[in-house]
Design a protein with these regions (language model features):
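Aromatic-lined carbohydrate-binding/catalytic grooves of carbohydrate-active enzymes
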Residues: 180-257
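Short, Gly/Pro- and small/polar-rich lid/capping loops
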Residues: 1-2
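Catalytic and substrate-binding clefts that recognize carbohydrates or anionic sugar/phosphate headgroups
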Residues: 52-184, 193-194, 199-200, 206-211
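A low-complexity, Ser/Thr/Gly/Pro-enriched, surface-exposed linker/loop concept
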Residues: 16-55
């Protein structure tokens, strides 16, 4: 693992880039270098880093960050990281245990969602810093697959990129692996119209696309295929698995159309 690594009996601090630092604390003194469910590649190459260390205190400087650690368990009064730049009214200093307010991330699924939903935290923030907590993820290798960590540990990644959001995303993907490309079939023509089609109207529409020589990769029948005027106790009417037989009297024949 390239970059600067400072390790004690129960802690390890790895400077991955001038703006990205890994913080580990393990009561058993066991640290992980392998892949996890989230992290695949921690090798970013050499990093310019200045370390000032005594038996009690560690100060670490990169071009963009200053880390101060009074050796011992990670606590708010012992460990902080400060960005070298004014990104918030009262400065951009993170103390261990603080939960940064981020610009949020994404949702993995819409299962059981009926209305607004809370997004997970992301790695971008108006304050200039954010956290990725990898402490609870499983370890992974090709031969044995997923397995639990042999020793519980704090395993955090501090992203201190200021307003360099593209840089943060670039290094995030370097750390976690590139997302898969969209499948080729998803890049074709999609047809989706919010309209109460009958099964005959929709079949006629598909026949017209074929007659006009317009290929379709995906065809969406939107939401009127199911009942929408339903009792409130069943939900909002925006979802469901009923069939509106006034519009689609023979669902099986329609689907096999």
């Amino acid at each position: 693992m390239a970059g600067s690594v400072i390790q004690g009996e129960n802690y390890r601090i790895s400077v991955l880039t001038e703006s990205l630092v890994r913080l580990e604390y393990s009561e058993g003194g066991v640290f992980e270098d392998g892949q996890t469910q989230v992290v695949q590649n921690r090798d970013f190459g050499p990093v310019a880093c200045e370390v000032v260390e005594t038996e009690e205190v560690l100060d670490l400087h990169t071009e963009h960050l200053h880390l101060h650690f009074e050796k011992g368990p990670f606590t708010p009064d012992r460990l902080f990281i400060e960005l070298k730049g004014q990104y918030a009214v009262y400065g951009s200093r993170w103390h261990y245990g603080d939960q940064p307010e981020t610009l949020k991330g994404t949702s993995r699924t819409l299962d059981e969602v009926d209305g607004a939903m809370e997004l997970e935290d992301g790695i971008l923030s108006k304050a200039g810093y954010a956290l990725l907590d990898d402490s609870s993820s499983y370890l992974y290798d090709v031969e044995s697959g997923f397995r639990a960590r042999p020793c519980p540990e704090v395993d955090l990644y501090f992203f201190g990129y200021g307003r360099d959001y593209l840089g943060a995303l670039k290094d995030f993907y370097h750390l976690t692996g590139q997302p898969p490309l969209l499948p080729r079939y998803a890049l074709g023509n999609w047809w989706s119209r919010y309209w109460p089609y009958t099964s005959q109207e929709y079949t006629d529409l598909m026949d017209r696309f074929k007659a006009e020589g317009v290929p379709l990769a995906v065809s969406v029948i939107d939401m009127d295929w199911h009942k929408t005027a339903i009792p409130a106790r069943f939900g909002s009417g925006w979802t469901g698995y009923s069939w509106n037989r006034d519009l689609i009297p023979d669902p099986a024949a329609f689907l096999h159309g």
